[in-house]
Every structure is written in structure tokens, then in C-alpha cells.
UniProtKB/Swiss-Prot annotation:
PANTHER family in UniProt: 4-HYDROXY-TETRAHYDRODIPICOLINATE REDUCTASE, DIHYDRODIPICOLINATE REDUCTASE
Keywords: Amino-acid biosynthesis, Cytoplasm, Diaminopimelate biosynthesis, Lysine biosynthesis, NAD, NADP, Oxidoreductase
Protein name listed in UniProt: 4-hydroxy-tetrahydrodipicolinate reductase
EC number of this enzyme: 1.17.1.8
Function: Catalyzes the conversion of 4-hydroxy-tetrahydrodipicolinate (HTPA) to tetrahydrodipicolinate.
Subcellular location field: Cytoplasm
Class in the EC hierarchy, top level: oxidoreductase
Residues the entry annotates as binding (S)-2,3,4,5-tetrahydrodipicolinate: 136, 145-146
A GO term for molecular function: oxidoreductase activity, acting on CH or CH2 groups, NAD or NADP as acceptor
Catalytic activity: (S)-2,3,4,5-tetrahydrodipicolinate + NAD(+) + H2O = (2S,4S)-4-hydroxy-2,3,4,5-tetrahydrodipicolinate + NADH + H(+); (S)-2,3,4,5-tetrahydrodipicolinate + NADP(+) + H2O = (2S,4S)-4-hydroxy-2,3,4,5-tetrahydrodipicolinate + NADPH + H(+)
Entry similarity comment: Belongs to the DapB family.
Any coiled-coil regions, as ranges: none
Organism annotation: Staphylococcus saprophyticus subsp. saprophyticus (strain ATCC 15305 / DSM 20229 / NCIMB 8711 / NCTC 7292 / S-41)
Length: 240
């Protein structure tokens, strides 16, 4: 498989290393600063990478969104999480002409976490829910795209929900429709996501901890391997 990388930060550097270990080939990268030295050819547009079988994106909305507006026909695996709604809308429009894949988190374990949550929420309607995520001190967005995805699952299964991001000025007791959302940034934490169900005299906690960023890179490569075998359409972990 010949892969075009969109972005060449820490994540796509891992994708490159792991993909080559699996005997895939990196044909080039799309980056904002093409004057910097890279170990692969640099491109400005997806359509320029004529040898590529698939593109894997770990970048940012500023780089990605303009590329998605261009004329190209190449399967794409997208992991950028900022401006999620815009990205998904554009991918769904592109999906009539090519297979596209999107996930806010490329870990299959996190996908499993959402499925566990889908089963737990209906069983625990009387429990309060608090969501917490923790990441390294270089992560710029908060809350994480994964935590937003977990909230979306809860919102779809409860009659009313209200996300609460800050309680330091609150002087009233918690309401049952509140979903507390908390972000921690520090050190080199790869990624932790925790769902706390708090009931009367008991709590249930569901946690996913990433122990290496390789799980995200391998998840993207695995998605790409499957995507190139599929017909045009919009894919997630649910249907790939």
C-alpha cells in the first residue's frame, strides 16, 4: 500500500515508521512548511500524489479543511478532531466519489469503550455522570475529541443532558441532567478517558488508558488497509 501523509507531526511520524515496518510505502507528505527538510517528497495538494493508494491524516483543521475542498479522488483516513462537524460534513459529501474514514480516536479500544457506554447508560438512568480526560501538556484542544464523542453517546441515550465545563461559580446543587466534563493537561500522558457513574452509595467507573501513541498510528494503518478494499462511502469503526 502506498500512503500519502497529511501532516508530519509526532503521530504521522509514527504512522510512517509502523507502516514501513508492515512493508507499506510512504510516497510523500503534505505539510504547511515545505521548505523544511522531510525524509519524503512534499506536496501541496492531494491530487499531486498520483502514486498514492490512500491518504492518512493526523494534522489540524487549518491544513486539512482547504485540502478537502480541492478536486481529488483518493481514499482518505482522517484523524483530525478540531472543527469536527465541518470535517464530517465535507467527508460525507466526498464519500459519493471515494471511500472516506473518520474517527476522533483511532484506538479500537476507545471504539469498544463507546459500545460499553451505549449498554451502560440505559441501565444507569438514575446515576449522575462525570466525564474526565487527561492528556500531555502539548495538547492544545480541550476537551478532547474522544470525550466529545463519549458525551454524544450519552446525549443520544438520555432524554435531557446539559454539559457543564466549570463549576467554580456555581452555588446550586447538581441537577441530574448535568454531565460534568473535565480536562487535565500535564506531563507526557498519552491519553486517558474516564466515565464515572455515581449513584446512591455506589459508583461505577469505566476507563480507557492509552499506553503508547502507537495504538493510534496502528489503528489508522489498519483502517487504511480495509478502506482501500471498500467501495465509495463514509466509514467509521462501526461499519468498516
Amino acid at each position: 500500500m502506498k500512503i500519502l501523509l497529511i501532516g508530519y507531526g509526532a503521530m504521522n511520524q509514527r504512522v510512517a515508521r509502523l507502516a514501513e515496518e508492515k512493508n507499506h510505502e510512504i510516497v510523500g507528505v503534505i505539510v504547511r512548511n515545505s521548505e523544511k527538510h522531510y525524509p519524503y517528497p512534499t506536496f501541496e495538494h492531494i491530487s499531486e500524489a498520483t502514486e498514492a493508494d490512500v491518504a492518512i491524516d493526523f494534522s489540524n483543521p487549518e491544513l486539512l479543511l482547504p485540502l478537502l475542498e480541492e478536486d481529488f479522488n483518493l481514499p482518505v483516513v482522517i484523524a483530525t478532531t478540531g472543527e469536527k462537524e465541518q470535517i464530517i460534513d465535507k467527508l460525507k459529501a466526498l464519500s459519493t466519489d471515494m471511500p472516506v474514514f473518520f474517527s476522533a480516536n483511532m484506538s479500537y479500544g476507545v471504539h469498544a469503550l463507546t459500545k460499553i457506554l451505549e449498554a451502560a447508560v440505559p441501565l444507569l438512568q438514575d446515576f449522575d455522570i462525570e466525564l474526565t480526560e487527561a492528556h500531555h501538556n502539548k495538547k492544545v484542544d480541550a476537551p478532547s475529541g474522544t470525550l466529545v464523542k463519549l458525551y454524544d453517546v450519552i446525549e443520544s441515550l438520555r432524554e435531557t443532558t446539559t454539559p457543564v465545563y466549570d463549576r467554580h461559580e456555581t452555588t446550586e446543587k447538581r441537577t441530574q441532567d448535568e454531565i460534568g466534563i473535565h480536562s487535565i493537561r500535564g506531563g507526557t500522558i498519552v491519553g486517558e478517558h474516564d466515565v464515572l457513574f455515581a449513584g446512591t452509595d455506589e459508583t461505577i467507573e469505566i476507563t480507557h488508558r492509552a499506553q503508547s501513541k502507537d495504538i493510534f498510528a496502528n489503528g489508522a494503518i489498519s483502517a487504511a488497509e480495509k478502506l482501500v478494499q471498500n467501495k465509495n462511502g463514509y466509514y467509521t469503526f462501526d461499519n468498516l
